[in-house]
Design a protein with these regions (language model features):
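Active-site loop/oxyanion-hole signature of alpha/beta-hydrolase fold enzymes
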Residues: 97-135
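Alpha/beta-hydrolase active-site loop signature
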Residues: 74, 100-104, 145, 167, ...
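Conserved serine/cysteine hydrolase catalytic core
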Residues: 206-279, 286
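Conserved HGGG/HGGXW glycine-rich cap/lid loop of the alpha/beta-hydrolase fold
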Residues: 53-105
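Conserved hydrolase catalytic core segment
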Residues: 131-174
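Catalytic histidine-centered segment of alpha/beta-hydrolase-like enzymes
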Residues: 288-298
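Alpha/beta-hydrolase fold catalytic core
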Residues: 2-67, 91-93, 132, 309-315
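A catalytic-pocket lid/entrance helix-loop region that shapes and gates access to the active site
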Residues: 163-195
Length: 315
């Protein structure tokens, strides 16, 4: 009997030791990888001083009209994520990609991520760049911030474009389990999961070097202080947006993904509801997933050019 208990005790101790060694290995591999990757992340764009911190911005193209691109939640590198769309738009427009605090190469911030604070920072950035007239084009959560933005700076906005953009009354605006996800990241298990299943990182159609940069920025920025605060403020930001509507004279176009419409039957009707009092608005559905700017950049750019041209001729 004592021999059996001794064997069981040794087995339990062995299992615990193996688990501790495994956890420690995952943690330290992540720690070392993070340090190594700091020197491998390549700079792009330019820095703008906003609210005492550095906000990263890319400007591409020399067109007379300006388009400002705003990312979806948690985008590791908005500049690299929007690359296919920027390449389609920049021959005709000046394209400005904003990397909000906590995204891409921008600084992190401890300022609460309310829609108002995010809008204020984006506007300050554009003012510093002397950009005073532009089309706002936003993906996903930027539909909420964009709605706040156009109501505050209507005189500066020529049009609003939503790429499968969020709407105030959508049903999945719940808070994320921030603490659990941060623990997953800090422990190194997020890196391990990505290593085992790299396809879970949604990537645009870019070269391998760019994909590597996106991957490194994903590990660097994942649920940093800004993104954690943003997630914790989802419910309030969506709720506050329910008081808003698009200005009557503002041209608005929504590019929606048919996969999102299938998953959420109310998706298209909710966007159409936002356009009911808009003089020049439309909804276009493309086949594809939530990241339409990865797969339908050419179609979006062509349709937007026609949409903007038609609205210019009606003025």
């Amino acid at each position: 009997m004592k021999k059996i208990l001794r064997i069981m005790l040794i087995s339990i101790c062995t299992i615990i030791t193996v688990m501790v060694v495994f956890l420690a290995a995952v943690y330290f591999v992540n720690l070392i990888s993070n340090e190594r990757e700091k020197g491998k992340i390549e700079s792009y764009g330019q820095k703008v001083l906003v609210d005492g911190k550095q906000m990263n911005v890319l400007i591409q193209g020399d067109g007379k009209e300006t388009i400002v691109l705003l990312p979806g939640y948690g985008t590791a590198s908005p500049v690299l994520d929007f690359k296919p769309l920027v390449n389609e738009l920049s021959p005709y427009y000046r394209v400005v990609v904003i990397e909000p605090f906590g995204y891409g190469l921008s600084d992190d911030t401890d300022k609460v991520r309310t829609s108002q604070n995010i809008v204020d920072e984006i506007h300050e950035c554009l003012q510093k760049l002397n950009i005073n007239k532009y089309t706002l084009m936003g993906h996903s959560i930027s539909g909420i911030y964009g709605l706040e933005y156009v109501n505050q700076y209507e005189n500066e906005i020529k049009a609003f474009v939503g790429i499968d953009s969020s709407v105030p009354k959508q049903e999945d605006s719940d808070e994320l389990p921030v603490s659990s996800l941060q623990l997953l990241h800090q422990s190194g298990f997020y890196r391990l999961i990505v290593k085992m299943n790299p396809d879970q990182l949604v990537m645009p159609k870019v070269d391998e070097q760019t994909k590597d940069q996106i991957k490194m920025l994903t590990f660097r920025n994942f649920l940093d202080e800004s993104q954690a605060s943003e997630a914790e403020n989802f419910i309030n930001n969506f709720k506050n947006a329910q008081r808003l509507h698009f200005p009557k004279n503002l041209p608005v176009v929504f590019y929606l993904a048919d996969q999102t419409e299938e998953e959420t039957p109310s998706w298209k009707p909710m966007h159409e509801e936002l356009l009911k009092n808009v003089d020049h608005g439309k909804v276009v559905t493309y086949k594809g997933g939530h990241y339409l700017h990865h797969t339908k950049s050419k179609e979006i750019a062509a349709d937007f050019r026609e949409f903007l041209s038609n609205n210019e001729s009606h003025r």
